[in-house]
């Protein structure tokens, strides 16, 4: 028979799992300019390019939000992605954000869903102001639109 403490412990666990699920759109509004999956290379270097996330165009300097609570695993410059943040959310979930103009977090920092982690930019391999947003489940990229609406 479950005790009150058992039930409270289970409720805390469920709330932690819910907070780890990347369901928050990472910008206020914006327009998807490139979807997850195969696409033409936007720079014309190849006829086919695999795109592991979605690109969300927005105003330069608009805030970028953590899609779920977690720990900043990486924050800095990454080739191609420019100013980049990767968040470990637990339960197999990670998110990554690229091309930002400025970062607002550091590696090792804890963030809550909705915290500002950076600002929309065009750093790295980019054609204009946007944030590249990736969701990984157990290390595999997945279409962010399956979780975030």
Q: What is each of the regions a protein language model found here?
A:
Residues 22-149:
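Catalytic cores of peptidoglycan-degrading enzymes
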Residues 1-27:
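Non-catalytic extracellular/periplasmic "stalk"
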């Amino acid at each position: 028979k479950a005790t009150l403490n058992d039930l409270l412990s289970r409720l805390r666990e469920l709330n932690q799992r819910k907070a780890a699920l990347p369901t928050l759109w990472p910008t206020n509004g914006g327009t998807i300019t490139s979807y997850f999956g195969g696409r033409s290379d936007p720079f014309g270097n190849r006829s086919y390019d695999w795109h592991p996330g979605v690109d969300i165009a927005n105003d330069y300097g608009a805030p970028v939000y953590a899609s779920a609570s977690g720990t900043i695993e990486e924050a800095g410059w990454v080739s191609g992605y420019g100013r980049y943040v990767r968040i470990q959310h637990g339960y197999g979930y990670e998110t990554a954000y690229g091309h930002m103009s400025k970062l607002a977090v550091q590696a090792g920092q804890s963030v809550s869903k909705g915290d500002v982690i950076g600002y929309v930019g065009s750093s790295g391999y980019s054609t204009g102001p946007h944030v590249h947003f990736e969701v990984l489940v157990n290390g595999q990229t997945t279409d962010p639109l399956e979780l975030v609406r």
